Amino acid sequence: MAALKSWLSRSVTSFFRYRQCLCVPVVANFKKRCFSELIRPWHKTVTIGFGVTLCAVPIAQKSEPHSLSSEALMRRAVSLVTDSTSTFLSQTTYALIEAITEYTKAVYTLTSLYRQYTSLLGKMNSEEEDEVWQVIIGARAEMTSKHQEYLKLETTWMTAVGLSEMAAEAAYQTGADQASITARNHIQLVKLQVEEVHQLSRKAETKLAEAQIEELRQKTQEEGEERAESEQEAYLRED
């Protein structure tokens, strides 16, 4: 009987040990799988959150006391001003040069018409002369329009020059020497360019004045000859 109890006890103990050996790996695997399922999204969350955190945190910059001083900020600001005024001056200079060039062309066109008209004096009838004069009047109106346009642009250009000169002076006063020198050199350059086209326009105006004087002289001479012929004919008729 004692032997039977001992055998049963050993059998029960072995059975439970066997079940424990079977269940422990299963439970362990289950717990491990569940832990893995739980930890996987947490890893993603931590990774994403960490990345966002890195993006959100500003990178500290080295302090530059010299670049943040009032004098440096003023020099930087005045450099921007000189750049802006120089750009404005360049654009107005280009527009003015183009306008003066167009005016000069119109002057030369009118000069050519006057010379042609002068060469045809005494060779045209009244109708042909009227037609030529209509062309001359149209060319003169075109020249006047171009002249007014360039005078208007010249006023704007002079304003741009004044702004650039003030910006250059401000740059000099604040210690932005390079910006001041650059602005003043630019002003001198555009003034030289405008003066060159002005000389061409003045030369054209001189040519026009000469053509008009010649036309007037020829016309006066022709009228004098016609008057002399008329007087001569009248004198002969009286005889």
Swiss-Prot record:
Tissue: Ubiquitously expressed with highest expression in testis. Expression is also high in heart, liver, kidney, spleen, prostate and ovary. Low in brain, lung, thymus and peripheral blood leukocytes. Isoform 3 is ubiquitously expressed.
Free-text domain note: The mature N-terminus mediates interaction with XIAP/BIRC4.
Record PTM: Ubiquitinated by BIRC7/livin. Ubiquitinated by BIRC6.
One biological process term in Gene Ontology: intrinsic apoptotic signaling pathway in response to oxidative stress
Site (Cleavage): 55-56
Lineage of origin: Eukaryota, Metazoa, Chordata, Craniata, Vertebrata
Residue window of motif IAP-binding: 56-60
InterPro entries: Smac/DIABLO-like_sf (IPR009062), Smac_DIABLO (IPR015142)
Domain of life assignment: Eukaryota
UniProt transit peptide range: 1-21
Subcellular location: Mitochondrion; Cytoplasm, Cytosol
Protein name in the entry: Diablo IAP-binding mitochondrial protein
Subunit annotation: Homodimer. Interacts with BIRC2/c-IAP1 (via BIR3 domain). Interacts with BIRC6/BRUCE; inhibits BIRC6 activity. Interacts with BIRC7/livin. Interacts with XIAP/BIRC4 (via BIR3 domain). Interacts with the monomeric and dimeric form of BIRC5/survivin. Interacts with AREL1 (via HECT domain); in the cytoplasm following induction of apoptosis. Interacts with BEX3.
Cellular component terms (Gene Ontology): CD40 receptor complex; cytoplasmic side of plasma membrane; cytosol; mitochondrial intermembrane space; mitochondrion
Gene: DIABLO
Keyword Transmembrane helix recorded: no
